[in-house]
Amino acid sequence: FNPEATAKDYPEVDLFGYLKTKKSENACKRAAVARLSNAISLEPYTGDMDFLTNMRLASQVKGLQNNIANVEIHHSLYSYTLTVDLDLVGIDENDGVSLSGKERAKRVVDLLNCIQHLYHDIKGRRENLAPVFVIGGLYEAKSPYFLNRIKLHKGDLNVALLKEVIENIEEPTLCGLLTGIFKNEDEIR
């Protein structure tokens, strides 16, 4: 990591923070202003397995025999939360950075646009984490209100729980969804 990289020139440094280290000096750090929670499966694991062998690797070593391996296969909808501290986007006191309101807004819009392409590579497979349901707003309190509040039961999204959370927030909240994903789509709308 180049210690000369600043939030002014690198949006990823601005949004996701950094730890700049130099030999014989204290580290300079910036906490992430955009935070993505862990992705949690909304559907149970059903025990699907893919059976593999290591034949290719074993063939490269004389005397080594191939082994069978099991890999879990899980297709599910996932819930994750993105929170962004809008007061800190484009502002970095460590490096004296203070971007214009227009540039700060652009960074947030760019981040939100990137989320539609979110995926996760794990154990040789790619998980599509592009949103099929989004809920949120601009809130005074910097709290991940919907973290662990998205629940799915037999294809139905728990709308009653979401309504309760929205009532407690008492600030405008918007949601959107892709057609054909949830059984209770009309209720969600």
Residue ranges and their predicted role:
Residues 1-189:
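RNA-binding basic/glycine-rich loop and surface signature characteristic of RAMP-family CRISPR effectors
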